[in-house]
Every structure is written in structure tokens, then in C-alpha cells.
Amino acid sequence: MRRSKYFTPNEVSLHNTINDIWVSYLGKVYDLTPLLEAYKGDVLLKPIIECAGKDISHWFDPKTKDILTHVDPLTGCIKYYTPRGRFIHIPPPCPRTDWANNFGKPWWKDNRYEVGLLSAKTRWIRIINTLTSQEQKLEVCSEESLDEILHRYLFYNSHAASYTWKLSGINLDMSKTLSENGIPEEDEFYCGSPDCNLFSPSICLYFNDDLTEL
């Protein structure tokens, strides 16, 4: 079984329009575009649209994985806590006969929208093609294997699989992560500074003379 794909927060943030809206919460990434299409024009979409491309884990109780609740000061009843305003599949504050509750699972419990996992930590690396001397800086997920990083790099070099990946002259195990290959984390002190590039691992690609280039 193929494992779930990892995404960086930056990748999630690119999906921030009404026609392409992703959010992340509790470590997973969701594509809510079909939800917006199904409820197009509904005012209850507003809080979701406002958070397009962002992490909304603070909406949830990490233990129950449900929306946070609170005691309504007026009724004394336990209700969902939605400080940004009520949104799709949240029941109205008072009983109403016109509220349709036949939607099945609420969207935040519906696995249909799940597209992958949110990386707990991202890393910057430099990939140097020794054949062409081209260098590409990539933000990758620390949980990804080198094979999965290779798939990211295919955007820049469609023949990336025709190269041997090395660090300091040592062949890398493509089935393992950067850390599992003994590549240490870059110094946190330099992250976000002009010197960050100096501390990003440089992976060198050496061309294999094979038939995949034909």
C-alpha cells in the first residue's frame, strides 16, 4: 500500500482561492474545493474561505479530533466553539426546522477530502547536477525518503532517476530519509538568515550512462 504524501506548509498555502482551497489540521492536509462547490454561495463558507491555505488545528480538540466546544452562557448547553462564526455543518445555536442535517459526516470527519500529511518539519537542501553544474534549492519534508525528494526534483530535471545521488562522495540510500542517511539538521540558529544557504546540505548528482536518456 502506497503511503500518504507529505506536504510543506508553503505548498498548502498556495491553494488559497475559492476554486482551489486547501487547509491543514491535526497533522493532515485536506482539499475542501469539492465542499465549496457543493455549498456554493452559502454564507456559512465564509470562515473556511478566510482560512484558505492555512492551518486550522486551533479549531479542534486534539483528543477528540472534533471542533472545540464550550458552555453557552445563555442556555448552559455544550455547543461548538466557533469564534470566527458558524460554518458549514455546524448546527444553529437554537433548534430550527429548516436546518438540513442529512449530510452524513461533517466535513472535518470526512476522509474524502484528505490529500496527505502535513510535514512536522521541513528542510532546505541544494541539489547540484555535476553534469550541467546547475544547482537547485528545494524545501522538502523531513519525513520524505530520497526517492520522494527525487520526485519533487523531477520538475527541474525529468531524468533525475538517471543520476546517482551522493553526499561528500558517498552514495545515498534512496529508500531512506535525509536523517536516516546521516545528513544532520541544519543549524536552527541560521534558519531564516542570509547565511541559511551555507548550512543547507548539498547533494551532488552524478550522471549514469544508461538508456533512460534516450
UniProtKB/Swiss-Prot annotation:
UniProt keyword Cytoplasm present: yes
Main localisation: cytoplasm
GO CC terms: cell projection; cytoplasm; cytoskeleton
Keywords tagged on the record: Cell projection, Cytoplasm, Cytoskeleton, Heme, Iron, Metal-binding
Biological processes annotated in GO: cilium movement; regulation of cilium beat frequency
SMART domains: Cyt-b5 (SM01117)
Cell compartment(s), UniProt: Cytoplasm, Cytoskeleton, Cilium axoneme
SUPFAM superfamilies recorded: Cytochrome b5-like heme/steroid binding domain (SSF55856)
Expressed in which tissues: Selectively expressed in motile cilia-rich organs, including Kupffer's vesicle, otic vesicle, floor plate, pronephric duct and olfactory placode.
Domain Cytochrome b5 heme-binding: 4-70
GO molecular function: metal ion binding
Keyword Iron: yes
Superkingdom per UniProt: Eukaryota
Annotated binding of heme, by residue: 39, 70
UniProt cross-references to Pfam families, sorted A to Z: Cyt-b5
Disrupted gene: phenotype observed: Mutants are able to survive to adulthood. Embryos constantly develop three otoliths in the otic vesicle at 24 hours post-fertilization (hpf) and recover to two during later development. Mutants show impaired coordinated ciliary beating in the otic vesicle and olfactory epithelium.
Role summary: Radial spoke stalk protein that binds heme under oxidizing conditions. Required for the coordinated beating of multiple cilia maybe by functioning in a redox signaling pathway.
Family: Belongs to the cytochrome b5 family.
Protein's name according to its UniProt entry: Cytochrome b5 domain-containing protein 1
Gene: cyb5d1
